[in-house]
A protein has these predicted regions:
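NUDIX/MutT-family hydrolases
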Residues: 105-138
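Active-site-adjacent beta-strand/loop module that shapes the phosphate/pyrophosphate-binding cleft
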Residues: 74-104, 137
Length: 154
């Protein structure tokens, strides 16, 4: 079994929209993920999130408040077949863009990432977002409406 993995995620909201990675899982539909990824040995969460945003957005961010902690125990969810031995703990932080998003400066897009997109918060539930439960954790103005620990949700 794999060790438990720490992952950091960016919540970037501006003008009633949230910035998410646009992804193609080869299933015929567009999906969206929060920018971020795994913490490396010797990195703080803040350092990891700044690195991940540079890799995936080509942008520098400032990292603010920790607002959610989510567990993902793969065997409990829809991707159990491929993620059965995965246990990841994700830490979601409010972030602000310090530079503009520029994918030509992105250094390491995720394999399934085909771009980024600003999605209207008032229509967030209309999109395929992973984890979908996170769309339920904020209102249409981006205000956090859930406790910090959201559990093993997808």
């Amino acid at each position: 079994m794999k060790p438990i993995r720490n992952s950091v995620k960016a919540i970037i909201i501006e003008n009633g929209k949230i910035l998410l990675n646009k992804c193609d899982f080869q299933d015929g539909k567009t999906s969206y993920l929060f920018s971020g990824g795994g913490q490396e040995v010797g990195e703080t969460f803040v350092e990891a999130l700044k690195r991940e945003c540079l890799e995936e957005l080509g942008a520098q961010v400032s990292v603010g408040e920790l607002v959610w902690v989510r567990e993902y125990i793969g065997k409990n969810h829809q991707f159990a077949e491929s993620d059965s031995d995965m246990h990841q703990i994700e830490y979601y932080f409010i972030c602000k863009l310090e530079t503009t998003v520029d994918l030509s400066k992105a250094t390491n897009l995720d394999a399934v990432q085909v771009g980024v997109e600003w999605l209207d918060l008032s229509r967030l539930k209309e999109y395929t977002i992973y984890p979908a439960a996170m769309a339920e954790c904020m209102d249409e103005n981006g205000k956090i409406t859930s406790p910090i620990y959201v559990g093993d949700v997808n």
